[in-house]
Curated annotation (Swiss-Prot):
Domain CARD: 1-88
Region of interest called Nucleotide-binding domain (NBD), as start-end residue ranges on this chain: 95-298
UniProt subcellular location: Cytoplasm, Cytosol
Residue stretches spanning the membrane: none
Domain of life: Eukaryota
Modified how: Phosphorylated at Ser-533 following infection of macrophages with S.typhimurium (Salmonella). Phosphorylation is essential for NLRC4 inflammasome function to promote caspase-1 activation and pyroptosis. PRKCD phosphorylates Ser-533 in vitro.
Entry function: Key component of inflammasomes that indirectly senses specific proteins from pathogenic bacteria and fungi and responds by assembling an inflammasome complex that promotes caspase-1 activation, cytokine production and macrophage pyroptosis. The NLRC4 inflammasome is activated as part of the innate immune response to a range of intracellular bacteria.
Name by which UniProt lists this protein: NLR family CARD domain-containing protein 4
Domain writeup: In an autoinhibited form the C-terminal leucine-rich repeat (LRR) domain is positioned to sterically occlude one side of the NBD domain and consequently sequester NLRC4 in a monomeric state. An ADP-mediated interaction between the NBD and the WHD also contributes to the autoinhibition.
Length: 1017
C-alpha cells in the first residue's frame, strides 16, 4: 500500500486509459472490483481521473487488492513497473541533464533563427529582429466581469504571474512577439522574475502535433533517446512551477491533435506547471473560464510606434513617415496597432525615395495581407463561397456606416460563412460576459475602408443590379454636412480604390447643394471665422456663417478625395465641376504637400474656387530656409507659401489674406507678400494685432494693385498709413477695429470721402471726438455706393452722431445695413433717422442697440417705430432704450406683424414687466417667424410667472440659435426651470443661451444643459 501511495502521482499521469481498462478487466475477474465500480471508472472523461479513481479504490480495499493491482500493472505496463522499482532500462534525468536541457533552450532563444522573424509572414521576405524591434507593450489586467482593472507592464505581469495566464488581443497586436520576448529574457538572465524557472518552452500551437513530448521535440529540442517520454514527463511533473510554457496562438490550435496541451491549459491544477497562452478575442471564450490571470494587449503607444519606425527604416524615410503620421489623425489612430505600423514601414522598404502613401494604399495592403496570410485556414471552401462572404462583409460594413453601427449581432451574419470572416481577421467576435456575441471590425477606420472598397466595386461592377445598388448608397448622401462628417472617410476609401468610382462620386457631389443640419458646427473651433459670442455676429445671420464653414469643409473634403484618388489627371473635368464656386482655407504654418500637387495637377480646379483664405502668423522670425531665428535677417512669411502661390500659373478669383500678431515686417516679407498677392484677381487683406506694422502698412498697400477689401484690427496706424489707406480708391470694404490713438489732421476721417467705390465701412472702438465725427459725416456724403455702415463703440463724440445720421439719410441711397451700436446715439439723431427712413427703403438690418436715449428719447423711438413699415426688407431690428420705453411695445408688435422675414430682434433694457412679456409671448404664438434666429431680452423686469407665461409663444421659434434673458437677481421657480428645459429640448438649432443673473443651483443647471453653450455668469 505504501508503495502505491508513494508513486500515485506518477501512476496517475502515466498509466494511460488502455492500461487502466486492461487492469480493470483483470481485477473484475479476480473479484477485486465489482461491475458498478468498473463502470464508474471507465466513464471518466480524462485518463488521469480514471487512474486516480482506480488507485483510491484499490487503497481502500487493503493490501491484498494492492498486490493484485501491482501484479496486473507488471503484466500490462512492464516499463512503468520497472521504473517505479528503480529498474528502468531508460536513463533517469539528473540535475545535470536538466541543466544541459536548459542551456540548449537558452542557446536557441538567443540564436538568429529565433530572434529573426517575418512580421508579415514567411511569404514576404521582410525580416525584423526581436532584440532591436521589440517595444514595451501596454497590458490591461481584466477582472471577472471582463472589465479592465489596471494597467500592467511586462515586468509587472511576470512579477504577479498566475497560471494559467491568458493574454488576449486582436490580430496584429503583437501577442506572439510578446511571448518570444519572454523566452529571450529568460535566456538572457536579465529578468529577475524569470530566474525562478528551470525550463521555459515557447510553442506555436498552430504546429502542435501528437503529445506534449512530441511537440517539444518537433519545435524546440533534440531529447536524447535514452530519456523516455515517461521519464521526461515525470520530471516536468516534479519540477512543477519551475517550468514555464509559453503557448502561442490558441485561436489556431486544434485540440484534437494534442490533448495533452489542451489538458495543460484546462487542467493546469493537475500539472502544476506555469502556463502563459495567447489567443485572439473571438477564441477567448474557449479558455476564459480556466484563466487565473487574464490580460489584454492594449494599444501601441505613440513613443513605441515611433521607436519601431526609427529602428526599421532609414533615418530620412523614418522622419518623412513620422511627419506624415503627425499630420493625419487617422494614421495616428492606426499606429496603435503594431501590425499596421509594420505594414506602413514595409511598403517603404526597397524604395529609392520616400512615397507618401494614401490611407487607402495602407488599408488595401493590410486587407490583402489578411486574406492571403490566412488562406490556409479556408481549405475545402469553394472560391465562390469565400467571395460571397467577403462581399457580404463589405455590405455589412457599408450598411454600418450609413446607420452609424460599428457593433453587429449574430443575425447580421446569418447569410454568410462566419468562419471565413473570423479566420481572415476581417471581423472580431466578442463573447466574454455577453448573452449574445458581438462582432466588430478591428478598427472603425478599417470598417470604413471595407465599406469604401465595397462601394467602389459596386459602382464599377459589370452587373447592372450592383451598379444600381451602389448608386442607391450615393443617393443617401444628400447634404453637405453629412458628407463632410458621416461619410467623408467612406468616400475617401471609395475614391482611393478606383478612378472610375471617383468619377461617379464627384458627379454626385457636384450636384449636392443642401447644407443639411448645421447643428454641431462650431464657429469657435474654426480658424476661418472670428471667435466671438453668437450675440455679436451682426455682419450676417448665424446660419450664413455656419453655411460658410460647411462649404469650406466641403472643399477640404474634395481636396482629400483628390489626394486619395488613384488617377487625377483623367478626372480633371469632374474635379473642376466640383470645386467651382467653393472656398478654401489654408494655414501658412502647415501647408500640406498635397496642396502643391492639387495646384500643379489640377490648376483649373484651383482657379475655379470663389476665394482662397490664407492666414499668416507672427512670432519667432524664421530665416528664408524656414528655420526660426531671433535675428531680423529672416522673414515671417514662409517661403513655402510663396512657392505655392507665386509658382502657380493661373489666378484665383479672390485671395483673402490675414496677417496676425506681426511685431515687425521686413522688406523681404513685403516682397514675399507682393508675390503672393499677385496670384489673385481680387485681394482681401485683414491685419490683426500687428503692433509692429505701424509705418509699414503703406509699403504693403503699395504692392496691392488688386486690393478691394482692407480690415485693420488692434493694429496701430501712423498718419502716413491712414493717408495711404484713403488713397486706395478701388477699396470696396474698409474696417478699422480697436484703434485707440488720437486722430491727426489729414488722417482717416478727413479723407474717407476719397474712397468713391467704398461699399462697406466698419469703424469699431476707435478714438474719435465730435470734430472727427463731423468730418466723417462730410466724407459719407461722397460715398454713393455704400450699402453697409457699422459704427460701434464710439465714445466722446458729443453730438457727432446727429451729423452722421443726417448725412446718411438725407438722400435716397442703397444702404442695406446700418449698425450704430454704443455710439452716443441721441434722441435727435433717432428723430432724424425716423423722418428720413423713406430714403433708406432698402434697409434690411437696423441695429441701434447699446444706446440709452435721454432727451426726447421716448418720442424719437415712437416716431421710428411708427415708420418701420417703410422697411419692407427688414430682417434685423435691434432698438435702443429710454425711460418708459415699454409703452411702445404694442405699437412695435403691430409693425412687426408685417415683417414675417424677421431674423433678429433686440429689446435690451426695455424694462419689460410680466404684462409686456405676456404680450410678446402671444405675438410669437400668433406670428410664427419661420426664420427667426436671435432674441435679446436682457435687462428686463420679468418674474418667474411672466417668463413661464412667455414660454408658450417662445417655443414656436423653431429656428432659434441664440437668446439672452439675462436679468438681475431672478430666483426662478422650479416650474419655470422645468418648462424652460422642456422648451430648450425642442429648439434643436440652439448654439448659445445667456441667463446671467438667474440664480440657478447645480440641479437647475444640469436640467437646462444641452448641446449649446449655457452662459450663467
Amino acid at each position: 500500500m505504501n508503495f502505491i501511495k508513494e508513486n500515485s502521482q506518477v501512476l496517475i499521469q502515466r498509466m494511460g486509459m488502455t492500461v487502466i481498462k486492461q487492469i480493470l478487466d483483470e481485477l473484475f475477474v479476480w473479484n477485486v472490483m465489482n461491475y458498478e465500480e468498473v463502470n464508474v471508472i471507465c466513464g471518466e472523461k480524462f485518463e488521469q481521473d480514471a487512474a486516480r479513481g482506480v488507485i483510491h479504490m484499490i487503497l481502500k480495499k487493503g493490501s491484498e487488492a494492492c498486490n493484485l493491482f501491482l501484479k496486473s500493472l507488471e503484466k500490462w505496463n512492464y516499463p512503468l513497473f520497472q521504473e517505479l522499482h528503480g529498474l528502468s532500462l531508460f536513463h533517469q534525468m539528473s540535475e545535470e541533464d536538466l541543466d544541459d536541457l536548459a542551456q540548449e533552450l537558452k542557446y536557441f532563444y538567443q540564436s538568429p533563427s529565433f530572434l529573426n522573424f517575418y512580421p508579415l509572414g514567411e511569404d514576404i521576405d521582410i525580416m525584423f529582429n526581436l532584440k532591436s524591434t521589440f517595444t514595451e507593450p501596454v497590458l490591461w489586467k481584466k477582472d471577472q466581469h471582463h472589465h479592465r482593472l489596471e494597467q500592467l507592464t511586462l515586468s509587472g505581469l511576470l512579477d504577479t504571474l498566475q497560471s494559467p495566464c491568458i493574454i488576449e488581443g486582436e490580430s496584429g497586436k503583437g501577442k506572439s512577439t510578446l511571448l518570444q520576448r519572454i523566452a529571450m529574457l529568460w535566456a538572457s538572465g536579465e529578468c529577475q522574475a524569470l530566474t525562478k524557472f528551470k525550463l521555459v518552452f515557447f510553442l506555436r500551437l498552430s504546429r502542435a502535433q501528437g503529445g506534449l513530448f512530441e511537440t517539444l521535440s518537433d519545435q524546440l529540442l533534440d531529447i536524447p533517446d535514452v530519456i523516455s517520454k515517461q521519464t521526461f514527463m515525470a520530471r516536468l511533473l516534479k519540477l512543477r512551477q519551475r517550468v514555464l510554457f509559453l503557448l502561442d496562438g490558441y485561436n489556431e490550435f486544434k485540440a484534437q491533435n494534442c490533448p495533452e496541451i489542451e489538458a495543460l491549459i484546462k487542467e493546469n491544477h493537475r500539472f502544476k506547471n506555469m502556463v502563459i497562452v495567447t489567443t485572439t478575442t473571438e477564441s477567448l471564450r474557449h479558455i476564459r473560464q480556466f484563466g487565473a490571470l487574464i490580460a489584454e494587449v492594449g494599444d501601441m503607444t505613440e513613443s513605441s510606434a515611433q521607436a519601431l519606425i526609427q529602428e526599421v527604416l532609414r533615418k530620412e524615410f523614418a522622419e518623412d513617415l513620422l511627419l506624415q503620421i503627425q499630420k493625419s489623425r487617422c494614421l495616428r489612430n492606426l499606429m496603435k496597432t503594431p501590425l499596421f505600423v509594420v505594414i506602413t514601414c514595409a511598403i517603404q522598404m526597397g524604395k529609392s525615395e520616400f512615397h507618401s502613401h494614401t490611407q487607402t494604399t495602407l488599408f488595401c495592403t493590410f486587407y490583402d495581407l489578411l486574406i492571403n496570410k490566412n488562406r490556409h485556414k479556408r481549405k475545402g471552401l469553394a472560391p465562390s463561397e469565400v467571395t460571397q462572404s467577403l462581399d457580404h462583409c463589405g455590405d455589412l460594413a457599408l450598411e454600418g456606416v450609413f446607420s452609424r453601427r460599428f457593433d453587429f449581432e449574430p443575425d447580421d451574419l446569418s447569410n454568410v460563412n462566419e468562419d471565413v470572416l473570423l479566420t481572415t481577421g476581417l471581423l472580431c467576435k466578442y463573447t466574454a460576459q455577453r448573452f449574445k456575441p458581438k462582432y466588430k471590425f478591428f478598427h472603425q477606420s478599417f470598417q470604413e475602408y471595407t465599406a469604401g472598397r465595397r462601394l467602389s466595386s459596386l459602382l464599377t461592377s459589370g452587373e447592372p443590379a450592383e451598379v444600381t445598388k451602389g448608386n442607391g448608397h450615393l443617393q443617401k448622401m444628400v447634404s453637405i454636412s453629412d458628407i463632410t462628417s458621416k461619410y467623408s472617410n467612406l468616400l475617401l476609401y471609395t475614391c482611393g480604390s478606383s478612378a472610375e468610382a471617383t468619377r461617379t462620386v464627384l458627379k454626385h457631389l457636384s450636384s449636392v447643394y443642401q447644407h443639411g443640419s448645421l447643428l454641431g458646427l462650431s464657429v469657435t473651433k474654426r480658424p476661418l471665422w472670428r471667435q466671438e459670442s453668437m450675440q455679436n455676429m451682426k455682419s450676417t445671420t448665424v446660419q450664413e456663417i455656419l453655411k460658410a464653414i460647411n462649404i469650406n469643409s466641403f472643399t477640404e473634403c474634395g481636396i482629400n478625395l483628390f489626394h486619395e484618388s488613384i488617377s487625377t489627371s483623367s478626372l480633371s473635368k469632374e474635379f473642376e465641376d466640383f470645386f467651382r464656386g467653393k472656398s478654401l482655407y489654408i494655414n501658412s504654418e502647415n501647408i500640406p504637400d498635397y496642396l502643391f500637387d492639387f495646384f500643379e495637377d489640377l490648376p483649373n480646379c484651383a482657379s475655379a474656387l470663389d476665394f482662397v483664405k490664407l492666414d499668416f502668423y507672427g512670432g519667432a522670425v524664421r530665416d528664408i530656409s524656414g528655420n526660426q531665428d531671433q535675428e531680423f535677417s529672416g522673414t515671417y512669411i514662409p517661403s513655402r507659401a510663396v512657392s505655392l502661390f507665386f509658382n502657380w500659373k493661373q489666378e484665383f478669383k479672390t485671395l483673402d489674406v490675414t496677417l496676425r500678431d506681426f511685431c515687425k515686417l521686413s522688406k523681404k516679407d513685403i516682397k514675399y507678400l507682393e508675390k503672393i498677392f499677385s496670384s489673385a484677381t481680387s485681394l482681401r487683406l485683414h491685419i490683426k494685432r500687428c503692433v509692429g506694422m505701424a509705418g509699414s502698412l503703406s509699403s504693403v498697400l503699395s504692392t496691392c494693385k488688386n486690393i478691394h477689401s482692407l480690415i485693420v484690427e488692434a493694429s496701430p496706424l501712423t498718419l502716413e498709413d491712414e493717408q495711404h489707406i484713403t488713397s486706395v480708391t478701388n477699396l470696396q470694404t474698409l474696417g478699422v477695429h480697436d484703434l485707440q490713438i488720437q486722430r491727426l489732421p489729414g488722417g482717416l476721417t478727413d479723407n474717407l470721402g476719397n474712397l468713391k467705390n467704398l461699399m462697406k465701412l466698419i469703424l469699431d472702438n476707435i478714438q474719435m471726438n465730435e470734430e472727427d465725427a463731423l468730418k466723417l459725416a462730410e466724407g459719407l456724403t461722397n460715398l454713393k455706393k455704400m450699402c453697409l455702415l457699422r459704427l460701434t463703440h464710439l465714445s466722446d463724440i458729443g453730438e457727432g452722431m446727429d451729423y452722421i445720421v443726417k448725412s446718411l439719410s438725407a438722400e435716397p441711397c442703397d444702404l442695406k445695413e446700418i449698425q450704430l451700436v454704443s455710439c452716443c446715439l441721441s434722441g435727435n439723431a433717432v428723430k432724424t433717422l425716423a423722418q428720413n427712413l423713406h430714403n433708406l427703403a432698402r434697409l434690411s438690418i437696423l441695429d441701434l442697440s447699446e444706446n440709452h436715449l435721454e432727451k426726447d428719447g421716448k418720442e424719437a423711438l415712437q416716431q421710428l417705430i411708427d415708420r418701420l413699415h417703410i422697411l419692407e426688407q427688414l430682417t434685423v431690428l435691434m432698438l435702443p432704450w429710454c425711460g418708459d420705453v415699454r409703452v411702445s411695445l404694442a405699437r412695435l408688435l403691430e409693425q412687426l406683424e408685417r415683417v414675417p422675414q424677421l431674423v433678429k430682434l433686440g429689446l435690451k433694457n426695455w424694462r419689460l414687466t410680466d404684462a409686456e412679456i405676456r404680450i410678446l409671448g402671444v405675438f410669437f404664438e400668433k406670428n410664427p417667424l419661420e426664420n427667426f434666429q436671435q432674441l435679446d431680452l436682457a435687462g428686463n423686469c420679468v418674474s418667474s410667472d411672466g417668463w413661464l407665461a412667455f414660454m408658450s409663444g417662445f417655443e414656436n421659434l423653431k429656428e432659434l440659435v441664440f437668446f439672452d434673458f439675462s436679468t438681475k437677481g431672478l430666483l426662478p421657480d422650479a416650474s419655470l426651470v422645468r418648462k424652460l428645459s422642456h422648451v430648450l429640448s425642442k429648439l434643436t438649432f440652439l448654439q448659445e443661451v445667456q441667463l446671467v443673473g438667474w440664480q440657478l443651483d447645480d440641479d437647475d443647471v444640469s436640467v437646462l444643459k444641452g448641446a449649446f453653450k449655457l452662459v450663467i455668469a
